[in-house]
């Protein structure tokens, strides 16, 4: 659940124009789970026709609260225009985090209380009206991961983590299409099941995952009736400081090196308000194991549909 109140306004300080937004927010997230039931019912190979195993039909365990997370924040954002070419955006959010986790008996497992300031800043330069160059830095607060069932701390919910993103890009408006290129880097805590000497695993936050990418995109109207959205991104993802050498030095699990998408929305000329939709999402090969010794093939997902809009 989330509630937010904000106040926006414009004013000048000499030759400098300001677009200021200030506000407050409150966010609450609760997680209620049943204790998992794990029973061995057989085994099979994914390369062959899957076996038909009988489904579990026994009683379910009681549901209980595992997480109660609350965030209270004050935020501001000021877009400052110095002239027609130069702008800057300065802002931030002060967050008060109060989060509790609970075990199967309802006792408090972790109680995290802390303040976190999440700044954001951007510098924008427009040499001409339809061309923008920018650089941006931001800091975010991400939800902590949940330990898998096989970990020694199974179903434990870890504390929220702080991520940092820096990017630089260029945007060009050509006719009714917006073209952009963005170079970015995201740093975040690495959350994974760490192998122990006794053969067990413990789900931890240790080390850092760094994603560096280049994304090209085009959005807008290709014709009077056809609207398109296209993007392609190359991503390099690495883990450092995890304490597990086999998980480092290669592309991070489940992160493809190439990703692309294309969507179209075409308004049919013979029926007012009726349009056909279509798109494709492509994901390149990616590792399916943290050691980087098992690889999942590339795949594409196709979508097709229609929409109709009218006024009543």
Task: Annotate the PLM regions.
Residues 20-24, 90, 121, 135, ...:
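Membrane-embedded beta-strand positions of outer-membrane beta-barrel proteins
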């Amino acid at each position: 659940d989330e509630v937010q109140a904000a106040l926006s306004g414009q004013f000048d300080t000499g030759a400098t124009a300001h677009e200021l937004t200030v506000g407050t927010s409150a966010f609450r997230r609760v997680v209620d789970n049943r204790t998992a039931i794990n029973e061995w019912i057989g085994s099979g190979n994914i390369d062959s026709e899957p076996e038909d195993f009988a489904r579990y039909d026994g009683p379910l365990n009681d549901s209980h609260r595992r997480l109660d997370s609350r965030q209270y924040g004050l935020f501001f954002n000021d877009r400052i225009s110095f002239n027609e070419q130069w702008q800057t955006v300065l802002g931030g959010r002060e967050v008060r985090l109060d989060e509790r986790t609970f075990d199967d008996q309802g006792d408090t497992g972790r109680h995290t209380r802390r303040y976190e300031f999440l700044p954001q800043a951007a510098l924008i330069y427009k040499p001409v009206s339809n061309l923008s160059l920018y650089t941006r830095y931001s800091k975010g607060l991400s939800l902590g991961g949940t330990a898998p069932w096989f970990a020694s701390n199974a179903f434990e919910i870890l504390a929220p983590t702080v991520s940092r993103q820096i990017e630089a890009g260029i945007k060009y408006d050509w006719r009714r299409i917006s073209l952009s290129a963005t170079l970015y880097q995201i740093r975040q805590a690495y959350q994974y099941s760490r192998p122990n000497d006794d053969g067990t695993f413990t789900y931890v936050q240790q080390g850092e995952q760094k994603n560096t990418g280049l994304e090209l995109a085009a959005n807008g109207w290709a014709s009077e009736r056809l609207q398109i959205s296209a993007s392609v991104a190359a991503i390099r993802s690495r883990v450092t400081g995890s304490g597990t050498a086999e998980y480092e030095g290669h592309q991070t699990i489940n992160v493809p090196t190439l990703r692309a998408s294309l969507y179209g929305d075409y308004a049919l000329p013979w029926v007012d308000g009726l349009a056909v939709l279509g798109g494709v999402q492509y994901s390149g090969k990616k590792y399916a194991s943290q050691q980087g010794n098992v690889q999942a093939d590339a795949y594409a997902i196709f979508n097709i549909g229609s929409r109709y809009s009218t006024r009543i």
